[in-house]
Amino acid sequence: MLQTYTATTRPADGPPRLHALRAALSAQGVQGYLVPRADVYQGEYVAPCDERLAWLTGFTGSAGFCIVLPDRAGLFVDGRYRVQARMQCAADFTPVNWPETKPAAWLREACPNGAVIGFDPWLHTPDEVETLEKGLKDSGITLKRLPNQIDALWTDRPGPPMGQVTAHPEDLAGLSSEEKRRQIAQALADAGQSATVLTQPESLCWLLNIRGADLPRLPVVQAFGILHADGRVDLFAHEAKFDGLVLDEGVHLRPPEAFEPALRTLNGPVRRTLNGPVRLDKTSLPLRVLNILRETGAEVAFMQDPCLLPKARKTEAELAGARAAHLRDGAAMVEFLCWLDTKAAQLVAEPEHVLTEIDIARQLEAMRGRSNELVDLSFDTIAGSGPNGAIVHYRVTEDSNRRLLPGDLMLVDSGGQYRDGTTDITRTIAIGPAGALEAECFTLVLQGMIAISRARFPRGVAGGHLDALARYPLWLAGRDYDHGTGHGVGAFLSVHEGPQRLSRVSTVPLAEGMILSNEPGYYLEGRFGIRIENLIATRKGEVPEGGDARDWLEFETLTLAPIDRRLILKDRLSREERAWLDAYHARVQTLLTPLVSPEAGQWLERACAPL
């Protein structure tokens, strides 16, 4: 099995580690320290050796940070993780609502004038540090760069990952690495830039048509790179990871320790490789990289990572791969949902029957594995029953594993990594008869999901413009959810990909080929969680009859699996909403029936019957 269920942290471990950290800070004459979740690559997924926040606090969520002071430790988490943080962390760590509470404001209130706060410049971006310093202006509180303080205390810290790198075939990528490098290099040259420093492994893997095995759930190699305006690439990674793999001409593999010296030769008075500034993305770059370049007198230009938008706009080959992956994944989901319905009926008839969250996660992984094409999960399966469903990113462990009960809602958010695509799907399933409140909230969430699915919009519209469509039915009922409506999704890369999002803060215009999730939800702490998620691909839309001859866009739904009709209040749906759902279910049945067992096919026919 790919997913394990042993708890990796214990609340009791936090207080003695916090005490040791405070002693180390006191010895260095600093009054505080920043402990981020991020590693040097600033990604969502980190290797076990980089789980510093979890080691200190016990919190295992994918986003957050801790500010340690002599008399308090604030754990900053967003709305997805507030319940989880309270469950995983000792009382020595105080959850702080973020981003509602800004770190600078918290420090101003908590620290005396003259306090010095330490941080590791490899683990924070220039954007983060500039924002914090601006917020602390005139407070008397200063930031100080320090060697990593957690690493000095973590005596049994695991070693760095050494997964093998493989080629990603051009027939799946749609473009050769040479074509991609030429395209990005030309953009640099057109902007008068000499090079760009690439610090996000997903960008490098996309650019070079390679995939790695350094991280669970994310098929990347941990590496840094420098792309020059003439198309050359210096790739800084351990040679042992590339055993037997021949890189393209113009791609030079160099050891990780050569990265800093290479930065010092990029563009400065001492030596210039090419004329023009070095392009840096200060939202994802380690601050230390910028510091090194400034030490050499290099000229820099702050712009977005030039690989992000081309990577987000999938080629026709990548879209075809995504459709194939979703057919395969949809068949696995149907087999799983058929199995779960059978088990749920048995549970209702025989209350002594035992069915747990781990049973569900294991069964779903087994169903996906039957295709023999599953490389990995795209994230640890979220299998939250009853009150655990209200923990947005709940990860079941042997300690938290809950027995399902009749009347529960079962929220299952899962996905697979296949060589031709990445999937992410959420279904909320009734375990026996559901309550009136559960059905009402499910219907509101469904209406929001359908609104995004049916959206037609002119070119130039961003995800921030569409986010409210998914929330509006909930808003009318005085309800909402504390996460974005959707995130970008990669092509056998990260299940969470930018820069596009369906979120009220997103300003990135949507464009053809962008794949996003569509996943509104509703969570009632202590009771239940509801989320319905499909992946959608942005495509060119038809001009409505009698409409303006504008450049319209719309969404193609990629995900294929029934939505639990037992939780739908049919009379609450409009005629258009019912028509969309019936058409979606008809398509699901047509495409998946040939791919599933006879038993699952019969179940699918019932699950997809018109409302």
Language-model segment annotations:
Residues 1-611:
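Active-site neighborhoods and metal-handling regions in enzymes and metal-associated proteins
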